Amino acid sequence: MLQHIVMMKLKAVAAELKKERLEKLASLLNDLKNHIPALQKMEVGLNFSTRPTAMDLVLSSSFKDEVGLEEYRVHLKHVEVLTYIKEVVEEARVVDYWV
């Protein structure tokens, strides 16, 4: 199984707006499970750490293989979510690995 992990840090904005953006992003990501068959499992977590190096959101998703990850990457619903991510995310880190 292939694990795809993405950690994101949102752009600096007022606390309430950041909270709204995080909730919207989490909702958009969680909805992908309903549209992309190759996506076998997905978890979205919102950070509660106050460390200055902490990211704001983590996405953990599982795929059978690299073909499934590619189907996810180019799927219209995922591309739509990426458009929102580009608007609100300042930094993202990705790790893909086999389990």
Region spans (language model):
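Short S/T/G/P-rich N-terminal loop/turn motif that feeds into the first structured element of a domain
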Residues: 1-56, 64-71, 97-99
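C-terminal structural segments of small proteins and small subunits
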Residues: 66-92
